[in-house]
């Protein structure tokens, strides 16, 4: 009996360890990609790092040799200390953790593999898609039935994102396409304290940090996590969603260097440090209503992060199928977020072809009236599920 207790304790310690390492890797990837995606004073950013890393996890499952090593290093698993042999189990356990404790918020995750009808998957890979990713298999004809294949993929995308994203692909894919790996996530969170629609008024927002415009702005005095770091001229806010499992973190840099310089100095460690500074305060919040819709071809961005092997002729994806040589042509990502008085709805699809101590003080003010960064995160696992940058409204 003593041996059994020791064994159980050991298993818990190991599981908790690689669970934390997976989170660290994913959050580093989130911040790295936020810095790497192209932006401008007129262009906003919004994406789901969790969706992208999950879709790429299905590629990882079929990679071999140098291609596997490149993915292992490029997605930060090596740097976070997650052993290569633990990665797939960590994906499965991590997904389960994100579903624990959901109450008032909705967080749905779905995976699928659209497979050319004549492509024979290796049984081990098919088993991994099922057991690790719970992926649905869609048999399609990319050669002769291109439009029908696209329609089936887009129907899946629309259903799994609760109609927030109509389609992932607008036109036919290359007839050489043999496999499209898909991940879709949907989040709906209701603010812990809702804003009053009647209090929403036009207020000034500085597009690009310089050009004033009038936008619908929600206002209310509410308890949120808040901290002003005067030396950095940075305001940090954490707005909770009902149930306490999710929150939106806002970073509002007021310094003269602007949001781009601030963003490029940001690291996952600094972000977590900023969030750790917030204290529960009564704050008069002014937050613009906004809706962002984005679409990315991530091939170049992933290459800039060192993920290169899967895109070249040297790619070794022989763990997927023995039928010919497979390479990844692109990684496509679409995301939508809408923030209003009720809360937040966000969806994303990827295809691979702190509440601290309560302090009673006078009301503070948070006026989000210029470009800012925001993150939607799971407050228990600390995962960054969505990330964005609002420059222009």
Swiss-Prot record:
Coiled coil: none
Induction (free text): Induced by blood feeding.
Annotated signal sequence range: 1-16
Keywords: Complement system impairing toxin, Glycoprotein, Immunity, Protease inhibitor, Secreted, Serine protease inhibitor, Signal, Toxin
Highest taxon of the lineage: Eukaryota
Residues the record marks as carrying a glycan: 198, 245
InterPro entries, sorted: Serpin_CS (IPR023795), Serpin_dom (IPR023796), Serpin_fam (IPR000215), Serpin_sf (IPR036186), Serpin_sf_1 (IPR042178), Serpin_sf_2 (IPR042185)
GO molecular-function terms, A-Z: serine-type endopeptidase inhibitor activity; toxin activity
One Pfam family matching this protein: Serpin
GO BP: immune system process
GO cellular component: a single term: extracellular space
Entry's localization field: Secreted
PANTHER family listed in its UniProt record: GH10112P-RELATED, SERINE PROTEASE INHIBITOR, SERPIN
Primary role: Serine protease inhibitor that modulates blood feeding of ticks on vertebrate species. Inhibits host neutrophil elastase (ELANE) and proteinase 3/myeloblastin (PRTN3). Moderately inhibits host chymase, cathepsin G (CTSG), trypsin and alpha-chymotrypsin. Decreases host neutrophil migration. Decreases nitric oxide production by host macrophages. Decreases host complement activity.
Family: Belongs to the serpin family.
Protein name, as recorded: Iripin-5
Organism of this sequence: Ixodes ricinus
